[in-house]
């Protein structure tokens, strides 16, 4: 009969520690395993695919238990972190063999989604940002950090719109918030399955202030203090590598909201969710992990300062002109490891011997990189060469101290080079001489006993011993051999001489290992003192890496240097190409297009059949702008561009069902973002606005939006539409120009030219698109007959309402032109159906329904 057991001292200790971390999985170290208990064990066994067992199985209340081996713990932690959980690592704080009573245990680190510094394969070029948000009367103080690299930045945001843009740009998984947070703010911040972590009012940190003297805004200082208090409380170790907070303004960069980033496939492909076939993947010829991260930042935050853009362009041009020097630079960069994260591991105390060798190898490349900079022409490179600190003292220290091929463990010896420390060398000599003595003893015992198979062995349990097979036991001399252990086929013995020598050897080995670890810690501390120098060098190398990447891609893809101008918003792109589509199709297969929008053109109204390339044309301009303002060369024959402050997009259909929003609601929300926030210096891309609702509603909204943008916003706008009636707006809107994607019919077949031409499209090609999709010939013939009948019966097509006189007030988006009444409901339905906007399946379903109604009659 099971018996109820009282709480054991160990479970009492576990429960006391668990109570301090109720929202985390507690990994409780017992020997070589981390154990999970109770609810943690039940949930952990499911998530981690562990065997669920129990402690005290015979009791009425057995305790659920599951465990993971200590050497593989990180992989299990990563799984829980990926699911959005926190993990508290509880270690044994003393040697169990020497402990009196219960072994002391304590949580040494709380790993969270925003603080995980273990970088998985394939993620080296990505940041893991943790953010902090502190609402105040005028907006939101906002800070973010990457614990693995030491980056720390802060700003003050004036609106929820600005806050959402920053959160999406950083792709943060965890947000630190104060205790007092409204439900409205909490709901907004949790979008995208972000984890909210509450940090009570923070006292100044014991490590010193992370707030620089230049940071004078009290709200910004407070949010930095809150974030750093959380990091220090969770990491429970030195964060000396985290730099003082740098203030920034999002408005100092080209701003893009979440929709623009997604629609343009800048960092992530919107269709696959992966990084392939994106602007980032195309431009990434970086050789270092830190260069890859900086490239993402440059693409995510293109510049507004025309002088800063020019500096980058000059550097790219110089590298482009010096092929051999660029090749030498690339060769050296491939041997540079992740200096930022190596510095972080040094500060964390998790650096090992192999990490230090990687650091030394990286630093050894710097003199050669400086030589390359000296051969380039641009003055900024020569200035960089003189400022670049090779940190040669750290490289020299590691070269003198650390074995070239050290073990992973830092506690088992074998790390420190001979000659670095005399005392360590003497211990090693003692061990070497003693082992020689052991070998000589083995030879003499074999000779004395006549047992040729006699061996002197060692293991951690019994130490040194003499092993003799049972067939030779009769040859053992009496009185001198003391039996130690009996095996199936052998006996193990010790002798007084062997026991004495064992003590000397083990003492020397233990002293050697302890001294070696102390020496390694001292070396680590010396490197830690130079972290700021290493971080400065990392920033310089990262920038060089991105610049050479831009130059390499420009050369391979035949990009040109764009001309940037301020003061006007004129666009002159000739022979422009969509960089990613061109890469996929091949340059010879891609058809380039011009985008000409001077002072008398604010809007291009784009018409043409589906699948003809309207969306590609629109995205092409936006990507060229982003590349140019990031400092890259661009895919065009000529590119003369203004400086844009924001990009807004509405491209493609997408529901947000998780938030209860239909395609049309998403469409209107995205349109409203541009209408509310765009300026005359912005770029707007609207694709098929109004298609998510009924025809007349959609056309009315599209026309009203066009008029509002034209009359009130004055931003450069590319607006594609399937409402051909809207093309007549060019008669009343002076700065609207019609363009269309060319297509020709050859022998009854439609051929897309993928070329943008002036003027509106002269007809719809919906039936031809349906033919390309492979719909049945009879169905297509019937659709063609219906179309001709419609065109004959309804010669007076619905025209757009006259454009109103421009007034300095917001236009109503919900006043639509009244539809012309029809005699037949079926004809009314036909008149409203736009074949060009329909997919082949839409057309087939429509014709099927139409036939059903006619047959009933």
UniProtKB/Swiss-Prot annotation:
GO terms for molecular function: ATP binding; ATP-dependent DNA damage sensor activity; damaged DNA binding; mismatched DNA binding. One of its GO terms (biological process) is mismatch repair. Keywords: ATP-binding, DNA damage, DNA repair, DNA-binding, Nucleotide-binding. It comes from the Bacteria. Transmembrane segments: none annotated. ATP binds at residues 608-615. InterPro entries: DNA_mismatch_repair_MutS, DNA_mismatch_repair_MutS-lik_N, DNA_mismatch_repair_MutS/MSH, DNA_mismatch_repair_MutS_C, DNA_mismatch_repair_MutS_clamp, DNA_mismatch_repair_MutS_core, DNA_mismatch_repair_MutS_N, DNA_mismatch_repair_MutS_sf. GO terms for cellular component: cytosol. PANTHER family: DNA MISMATCH REPAIR PROTEIN MSH1, MITOCHONDRIAL (PTHR11361:SF34), DNA MISMATCH REPAIR PROTEIN MUTS FAMILY MEMBER (PTHR11361). Belongs to the DNA mismatch repair MutS family. This protein is involved in the repair of mismatches in DNA. It is possible that it carries out the mismatch recognition step. This protein has a weak ATPase activity. This is DNA mismatch repair protein MutS. It comes from Lacticaseibacillus casei (strain BL23) (Lactobacillus casei). The lineage of its organism: Bacteria, Bacillati, Bacillota, Bacilli, Lactobacillales.
């Amino acid at each position: 009969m099971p018996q109820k057991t009282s709480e054991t001292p160990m479970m009492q200790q576990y429960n006391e520690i668990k109570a301090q971390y109720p929202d985390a999985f507690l990994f409780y170290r017992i020997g070589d395993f981390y154990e999970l208990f109770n609810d943690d064990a039940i949930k952990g066994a499911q998530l981690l695919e562990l065997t669920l067992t129990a402690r005290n199985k015979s009791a009425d209340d057995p305790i659920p238990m599951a465990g993971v081996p200590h050497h593989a713990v990180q992989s299990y932690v990563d799984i829980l972190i990926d699911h959005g959980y926190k993990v508290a690592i509880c270690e044994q704080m003393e040697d169990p063999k020497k402990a009196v009573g219960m072994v002391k245990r304590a949580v040494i680190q709380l790993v969270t989604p925003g603080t995980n510094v273990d970088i998985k394969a394939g993620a080296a070029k990505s940041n893991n940002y943790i953010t902090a948000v502190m609402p105040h009367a005028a907006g939101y103080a906002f800070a973010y950090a990457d614990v693995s690299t030491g980056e720390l930045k802060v700003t003050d945001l004036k609106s929820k719109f600005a806050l959402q843009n920053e959160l999406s740009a950083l792709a943060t998984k965890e947000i630190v918030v104060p205790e007092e947070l409204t439900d409205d703010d909490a709901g907004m911040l949790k979008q995208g399955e972000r984890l909210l972590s509450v940090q009570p009012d923070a006292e100044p940190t014991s490590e010193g202030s992370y707030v620089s003297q230049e940071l004078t805004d009290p709200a910004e200082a407070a949010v930095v203090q809150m974030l750093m208090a959380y990091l220090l409380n969770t990491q429970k170790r030195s964060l000396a590598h985290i730099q003082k907070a740098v203030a920034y303004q999002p408005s100092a960069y080209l701003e893009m909201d979440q929709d623009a980033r997604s629609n343009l496939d800048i960092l992530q492909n919107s269709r696959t969710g992966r990084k392939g076939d994106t602007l980032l993947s195309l431009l990434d010829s970086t050789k270092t992990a830190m260069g890859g991260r900086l490239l993402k930042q440059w693409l995510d935050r293109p510049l507004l300062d025309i002088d800063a853009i020019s500096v980058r362009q000059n550097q790219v041009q110089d590298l482009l002109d010096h092929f051999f020097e660029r090749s030498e630079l690339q060769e050296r960069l491939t041997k540079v490891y992740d200096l930022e994260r190596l510095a972080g591991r040094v500060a964390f105390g998790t650096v090992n011997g192999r990490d230090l060798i990687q650091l030394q190898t990286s630093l050894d490349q710097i003199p050669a990189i400086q030589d390359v900079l000296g051969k380039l022409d641009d003055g900024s490179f020569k200035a960089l060469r003189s400022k670049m600190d090779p940190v040669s003292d750290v490289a020299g220290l590691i070269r003198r101290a650390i074995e070239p091929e050290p073990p992973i463990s830092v506690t088992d010896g074998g790390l420190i080079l001979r000659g670095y420390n005399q005392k360590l060398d003497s211990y090693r000599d003692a061990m070497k001489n003693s082992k020689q003595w052991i070998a000589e003893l083995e030879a003499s015992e074999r000779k004395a006993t006549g047992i040729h198979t006699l061996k002197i062995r060692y293991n951690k349990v019994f130490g040194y011993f003499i092993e003799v097979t049972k067939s030779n036991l009769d040859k053992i001399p009496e009185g001198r051999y003391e039996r130690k252990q009996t095996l199936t086929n052998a006996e193990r013995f010790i002798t007084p001489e062997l026991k004495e020598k064992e003590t000397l050897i083990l003492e020397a080995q233990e002293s050697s290992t302890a001294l070696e670890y102390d020496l390694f810690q001292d070396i680590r501390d010396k490197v830690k003192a130079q972290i700021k120098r290493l971080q400065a060098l990392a920033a310089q190398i990262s920038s060089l890496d991105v610049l050479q990447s831009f130059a390499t891609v420009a050369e391979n893809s035949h990009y040109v240097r764009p001309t940037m101008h301020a003061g006007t918003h004129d666009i002159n792109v000739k022979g422009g190409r969509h960089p990613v589509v061109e890469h996929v199709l091949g340059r010879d297969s891609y058809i380039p297009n011009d985008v000409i929008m001077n002072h008398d053109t604010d809007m291009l109204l784009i018409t043409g059949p589906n699948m003809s390339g309207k969306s590609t044309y629109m995205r092409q301009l936006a990507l060229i702008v982003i590349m140019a303002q990031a400092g890259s060369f661009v895919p065009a024959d000529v590119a003369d561009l203004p400086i844009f402050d924001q990009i807004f997009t509405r491209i493609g259909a997408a529901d947000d069902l998780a938030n209860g929003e239909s395609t049309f609601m998403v469409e209107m929300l995205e349109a409203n973002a541009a209408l509310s926030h765009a300026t005359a210096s912005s770029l707007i891309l609207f694709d098929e606005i109004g298609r998510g609702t009924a025809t007349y509603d959609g056309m009315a909204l599209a026309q009203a939006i066009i008029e509002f943008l034209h009359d009130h916003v004055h931003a450069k706008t590319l607006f594609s539409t399937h409402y051909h009636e809207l093309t007549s707006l060019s008669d009343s809107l002076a700065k609207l120009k019609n363009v269309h994607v060319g297509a020709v019919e050859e022998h009854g077949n439609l051929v897309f030219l993928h070329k943008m031409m002036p003027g509106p499209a002269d007809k719809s090609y919906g039936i031809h698109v349906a033919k390309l999709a492979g719909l049945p010939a009879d169905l297509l013939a019937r659709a063609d007959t219906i179309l001709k009948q419609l065109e004959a019966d309804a010669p007076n097509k619905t025209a757009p309402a006259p454009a109103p006189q421009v007034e300095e007030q917001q236009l109503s988006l919900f006043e639509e032109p009244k539809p012309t009444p029809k005699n037949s409901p079926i004809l009314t339905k036909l008149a409203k159906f736009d074949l060009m906007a329909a997919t082949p399946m839409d057309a087939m379903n429509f014709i099927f329904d139409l036939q059903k109604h006619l047959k009933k009659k």
